């Protein structure tokens, strides 16, 4: 395989769809640095591994000498992306957006080279557009065209409201590509309508239309739904090394390969080698450990990755308790507290319903003994180690 073909294969790694692939090949063969754009609306202060799928792809282009533009949608963040939503998304304030944007910059530079990354804000050109410019932009498309979007179509069919400003979101995202003169835009498969809008607007402005490279949405820890904080199935890149290690080790062996393809920087040949080793009898757990250590080293450091590995071995294979276990005191009103309420108050579960479910599954323990009675009452004056699942521990004194 030639160097060019090898580089192109790496750029295609994990991609769900490229529109148009032949265009991308032509652009790459010119040998000129291309402008590669990916936009992120700072709707929450922290990123999770699902967000890094696109950032990793930016890194691949960056390593090949292309100009990477990390676009922070401070303007679009105040509109609220309607993609995949069945209700109008709550818009953020300017202050919220800018505060979140600062944390984004800190986090993405754990992956991208800051010296070779352009950080742009789409308010730079959108604020200058003004009311007249926004109306002119709105005239570029029809309501019928906007209703081709699946989410809008479903909401209309179900009698759910669609706010007028939501129609502006894909137009603004498309105009970002015009303002940046993007050669390539990266996005998730759920963004296809918006990404293609960029091509349409660039054509109408006499620009060469951007190539669209779409990446899949990373499945969360459950292996079914996309990774999302609201679903609780995420791995945050600011998670502690211990939490990150435990979460990665909890994924299925099948999902592990998906994470290797989309999150690991290891060459595909090396990953295929892992598969061969497992076919020949290697324990998949050991391969999963390598993935966990690689990701923790990226977002923390090598020492943290090794320490998290050592703690995992001690806790789950040797039965040791974690060194950083929180110590809590829970005060009762009448000298006793129900086990479900205690676990909720200690933050080991999100609700009493979660507590009952974990007890039923045999996942709640007191001093390493399974709790089998959901009506168990804990008396004041006792101290014990409470555990829920494999990763949540607390030494709790009831008073």
From Swiss-Prot:
It is found in: Cytoplasm. InterPro entries: aa-tRNA-synth_I_CS, aa-tRNA-synth_Ic, Rossmann-like_a/b/a_fold, S4_RNA-bd_sf, Tyr-tRNA-ligase, Tyr-tRNA-ligase_bac-type, Tyr-tRNA-ligase_bac_2. It comes from the Bacteria. CDD domains: S4, TyrRS_core. Keywords: Aminoacyl-tRNA synthetase, ATP-binding, Cytoplasm, Ligase, Nucleotide-binding, Protein biosynthesis, RNA-binding. The keyword Cytoplasm applies. It catalyses: tRNA(Tyr) + L-tyrosine + ATP = L-tyrosyl-tRNA(Tyr) + AMP + diphosphate + H(+). A motif ('HIGH' region) lies at residues 42-51. PROSITE patterns: AA_TRNA_LIGASE_I, S4. GO terms for biological process: tyrosyl-tRNA aminoacylation. GO terms for cellular component: cytosol. Its main location: cytoplasm. It is an enzyme of class 6 (ligase). A motif ('KMSKS' region) lies at residues 226-230. Residues 337-398 form the S4 RNA-binding domain. One of its GO terms (molecular function) is ATP binding. Its EC number is 6.1.1.1. ATP binds at residue 229. Homodimer. Belongs to the class-I aminoacyl-tRNA synthetase family. TyrS type 2 subfamily. Catalyzes the attachment of tyrosine to tRNA(Tyr) in a two-step reaction: tyrosine is first activated by ATP to form Tyr-AMP and then transferred to the acceptor end of tRNA(Tyr). This is Tyrosine--tRNA ligase. It comes from Colwellia psychrerythraea (strain 34H / ATCC BAA-681) (Vibrio psychroerythus). The gene is tyrS.
């Amino acid at each position: 395989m030639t160097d060019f073909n090898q580089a192109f294969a790496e750029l295609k790694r994990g991609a769900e769809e490229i529109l148009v692939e032949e265009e991308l090949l032509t652009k790459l063969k010119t040998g000129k640095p291309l402008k590669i754009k990916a936009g992120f609306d700072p709707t929450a202060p922290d990123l999770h591994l699902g967000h890094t799928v696109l950032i990793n792809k930016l890194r691949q282009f960056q390593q090949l000498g292309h100009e990477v533009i990390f676009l922070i949608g401070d303007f679009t963040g105040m509109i609220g992306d309607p993609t995949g939503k069945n209700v109008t998304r709550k818009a953020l304030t300017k202050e919220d957006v800018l505060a979140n944007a600062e944390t984004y910059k800190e986090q993405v530079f754990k992956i991208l080279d800051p010296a070779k990354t352009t950080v742009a804000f789409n308010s730079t050109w959108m604020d200058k557009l003004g009311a007249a410019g926004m109306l002119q932009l709105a005239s570029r498309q029809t309501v019928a065209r906007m209703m081709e979007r699946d989410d809008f179509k479903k909401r209309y069919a179900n009698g759910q409201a669609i706010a007028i400003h939501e129609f502006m979101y894909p137009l603004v995202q498309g105009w970002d590509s015009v303002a940046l003169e993007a050669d390539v835009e990266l996005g998730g498969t759920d963004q296809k309508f918006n990404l293609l809008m960029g091509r349409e607007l660039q054509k109408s402005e006499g620009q060469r239309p951007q190539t669209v490279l779409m990446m899949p949405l990373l499945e969360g820890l459950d292996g079914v739904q996309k990774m999302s904080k609201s679903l609780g199935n995420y791995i945050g890149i600011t998670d502690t090394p211990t939490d990150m290690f435990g979460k990665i080790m909890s994924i299925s062996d099948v999902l592990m390969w998906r994470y290797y393809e989309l999150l690991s920087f290891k060459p595909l040949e090396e990953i295929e080698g892992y598969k061969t080793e497992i076919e020949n009898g290697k324990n998949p757990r050991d391969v999963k450990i390598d993935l966990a250590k690689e990701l923790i080293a990226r977002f923390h450091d090598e020492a943290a990755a090794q320490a998290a590995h050592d703690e995992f071995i001690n806790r789950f294979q040797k039965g040791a308790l974690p060194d950083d276990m929180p110590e809590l005191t829970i005060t009762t009103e009448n000298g006793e507290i129900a086990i479900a309420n205690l676990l909720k108050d200690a933050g080991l579960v999100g609700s009493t319903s979660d507590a009952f479910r974990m007890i039923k599954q045999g996942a709640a323990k007191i001093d390493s003994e399974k709790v089998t009675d959901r009506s168990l009452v804990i008396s004041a004056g006792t101290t014990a180690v409470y555990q829920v699942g494999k990763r949540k521990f607390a030494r709790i004194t009831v008073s």
